[in-house]
């Protein structure tokens, strides 16, 4: 599970994969604005880089005590970064149900050897304060 704002940081997505994740859910309450553009590119990137499925969930509606307009558009992507079915509605609550072939995880990880080819010796600066 990766929650809302965390999705902007690839290090955590990688840690989930290295710890055996095959499916990562990312619940969010994200309103329109700059991050709407990122909504459809970050999670497929996490799926590809880590060879797992991603379920990206965002709420819809407007907060009564503010002007936040939440844009929904929940979706699932496979380990190749491809959308599974249609993206959810931008205005109506709905339940998305998707079939996933879990054997795709191993196929993708064996084809794209991103874990094998990574260079942790180069990452010291990523974890320095």
Where are these regions (language model features)?
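CN hydrolase (nitrilase-like) catalytic-core segments centered on the catalytic cysteine
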Residues: 4-94
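Cysteine/selenocysteine-centered motifs that mediate thiol-based redox chemistry or coordinate metal-sulfur cofactors
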Residues: 14-18, 104-129
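Conserved residues at beta->alpha junctions
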Residues: 3-4, 99
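A general marker of short, structured functional hotspots
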Residues: 1, 35, 67, 110-111, ...
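A short, polar/charged loop-to-alpha-helix boundary motif
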Residues: 92-110
């Amino acid at each position: 599970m990766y929650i809302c704002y965390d999705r902007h940081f690839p290090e955590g997505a990688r840690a989930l994969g290295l710890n055996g994740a095959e499916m990562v859910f990312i619940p969010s309450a994200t309103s329109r604005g700059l991050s709407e553009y990122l909504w459809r590119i970050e999670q497929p990137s996490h799926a590809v880089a880590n060879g797992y499925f991603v379920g990206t969930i965002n709420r819809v509606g407007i907060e009564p005590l503010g002007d936040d307009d939440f844009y929904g558009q929940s979706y699932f992507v496979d380990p190749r970064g491809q959308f599974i079915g249609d993206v959810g509605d931008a205005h109506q609550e709905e339940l998305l149900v998707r079939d996933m072939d879990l054997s795709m995880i191993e196929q993708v990880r064996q084809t794209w050897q991103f874990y094998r080819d990574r260079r942790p010796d180069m990452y010291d600066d990523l974890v320095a304060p």
